[in-house]
Amino acid sequence: KALLRLNSRIRPVTLRREGMGYHETTVPEGDSASSSPDLQSSTDFFASATAIRSLIQNPGGGHSEAISDINNPVRNPDTKTANILSSQIPPDAFYVFKKALDSGEFLTENSLDSILSYCLMKENVESLSSYMDVSEDLARRIINQQNLLLSFSQSVSVLKTRELTQTRIQRALLHIILNIHTAPTQIPFARVLGFRKESSELLSRIKQHSRIPLITKLADAQNLLDSEGNQILSETVFSSNLYEKLLCLKTGRKFCHESQKQLIIL
């Protein structure tokens, strides 16, 4: 619809999903990397993201405690878990992935438990209904079931119905936490998070000819954006800082504000 509305020359192409189902929670046996290193041949060995997250949180197959939650000590994945993960993730990505696991620098949805509880306790049906993706029916259900809501994931299970899907409720709860009431009609800026050195000339040309401001330093944003753009950027920075704060609480490392983070240059 967006392409038609913009009269775009882009031709969309659908790609058939390979491997396990979208919400499959088990990791398949076998080596996906060796079976299909370029992801082009048909195989049943591709795990879903849900299954990979489940393996990280429950390395014993659902019988052990979730590793490295916000209130639990950081615990590295065992060798068996690491080997299974390495068979499901491309080598270069697995290196970064395992580094984060070993240092405990990752969050699960239940890292938001305390924040979610606080946010829901101060709301009523009318105020909840003002958040993006929160219908009046969902707002009433949240208030009626509030005494039963414990963790983030458990809250989703309690609140979901045939009409209110798991994904919809997850989005709604995140919007409540992040204080998001409406979606912007358009994004009035582009923010660069990183680039390759050899692409610096291209970046310069984009900056010169783009119809919207290209942000490389947050300190410059206020003068480049209008009030709507600054508001959207402020919400983005808040979300990033919240994630960073939760990581710091979990790992004990020093907090780094989003405005202090350097561009990634490869």
Predicted regions and their residues:
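Active-site cores that bind ATP or allylic diphosphates and position pyrophosphate for catalysis
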Residues: 1-266
